[in-house]
């Protein structure tokens, strides 16, 4: 896979200190038999209710109903990964007012393109957060450190009703060693599943007949191979091409597995805006939304480049439009970085 070489004899990758857990198995009549539990996690919901899904930025979605509203993974302004990533989408007009008006915020994991301190500083301190109950508490600890204490830690695969509303939700763990998660919720007979950018979500045990499936799609998130001088340009191109194809194949499999009526590509709208990263920007080719126009026959693509707000009545999409947006940061990335990092300088003497 994209990690590199896996040595099945010892159950470890050769290039990173990661092991895979051995499956329980039996040998019956010289056949290797592995038993899988394929129970489908399903939340109830029968009523035909209206719900609106709005793309705000990168992995940040706004979900609105007559009873409750929330956003996911707020990164709207500022940079991520030590200024390596910048938002590709201009911020929505009055975005801080929009964000502060919701009932709660779901944060999938603590990477800075999902839990972003530049964005969080604009959010009211009494905001409610629903976060995964990771053993390390990696999300909740960071929120508490930055002044947020209204935190509900959802245990994986437990189902929750939000107060007295029709919103039912559960959080799935990624199927690997990382602190990562995805979100599944229903509102009436509208259902939503997002893998965000996690690997092997819930060990691929998906609910089926999903109304809207959302996931990352772009790739280009790793410093490997472009930032490695030990890899020649030809090999870099091969690795990047392989990774993009692998991501496309995974997305298609997940769409098929979920039986989704609609697919929303998101969590991939970032760019390398700093002048020092021009070479990365020019060579770090990513998948585009348009690369997913040829989907499973029963699934329709929601193209954020065309419309970013979608209106559903139950499982039926009945309208779409564009929201107003401000311009991107007036200040250049270099000015922003200078202001941020000027107090972080150190002397080599």
Model-identified regions with their sequence ranges:
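Cap/insert and terminal regions of metallo-dependent hydrolase folds
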Residues: 1-12, 134, 203-297
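Zn-dependent metallo-beta-lactamase
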Residues: 1-71, 75-80, 84-92
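Pre-active-site segment of Zn-dependent metallo-hydrolases
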Residues: 45, 66-110, 117-118, 122, ...
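C-terminal regulatory/interaction regions
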Residues: 2-20, 25, 34, 281-349
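Catalytic core of the metallo-beta-lactamase
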Residues: 56-66, 160-216
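Metallo-beta-lactamase
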Residues: 19-48, 132-190
């Amino acid at each position: 896979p994209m990690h590199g070489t896996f040595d099945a004899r010892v159950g470890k990758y050769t290039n990173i200190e990661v092991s895979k857990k051995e499956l329980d198995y039996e040998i019956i009549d010289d056949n290797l038999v592995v038993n899988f539990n394929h129970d489908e996690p399903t939340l109830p919901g029968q009523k035909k209710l209206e719900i609106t899904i709005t793309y705000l930025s990168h992995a940040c979605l706004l979900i609105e109903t007559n009873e409750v509203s929330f956003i996911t993974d707020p990164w709207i302004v500022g940079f991520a990964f030590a200024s390596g990533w910048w938002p590709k989408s201009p911020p929505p007009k009055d975005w801080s007012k929009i964000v502060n008006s919701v009932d709660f915020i779901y944060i999938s994991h603590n990477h800075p393109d999902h839990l972003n301190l530049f964005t969080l500083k604009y959010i009211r301190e009494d905001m409610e957060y629903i976060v995964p109950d990771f053993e390390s508490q990696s999300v909740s600890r960071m929120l508490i450190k930055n002044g947020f204490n209204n935190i509900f830690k959802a245990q994986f695969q437990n189902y929750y009703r939000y107060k007295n509303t029709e919103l039912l939700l559960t959080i799935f763990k990624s199927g690997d060693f990382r602190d990562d998660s995805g979100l599944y919720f229903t509102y009436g007979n509208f259902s939503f599943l997002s893998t965000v950018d996690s690997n092997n979500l819930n060990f691929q045990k998906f609910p089926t007949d999903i109304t809207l499936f959302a996931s990352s799609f772009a790739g280009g998130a790793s410093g490997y191979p472009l930032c490695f001088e030990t890899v020649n340009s030809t090999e870099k191109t091969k690795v990047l091409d392989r990774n993009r194809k692998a991501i496309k194949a995974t997305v298609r499999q997940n769409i098929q597995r979920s039986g989704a009526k609609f697919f929303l590509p998101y969590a991939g709208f970032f760019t390398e805006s700093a002048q020092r990263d021009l070479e990365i920007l020019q060579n770090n080719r990513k998948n585009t939304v348009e690369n997913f126009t040829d989907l499973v026959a029963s699934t329709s693509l929601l193209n954020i480049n065309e419309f970013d707000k979608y209106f559903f009545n139950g499982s039926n999409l009945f309208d779409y439009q564009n929201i107003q947006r401000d311009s991107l940061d007036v200040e250049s990335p270099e000015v922003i970085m200078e202001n941020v990092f000027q107090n972080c300088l150190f002397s080599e003497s």
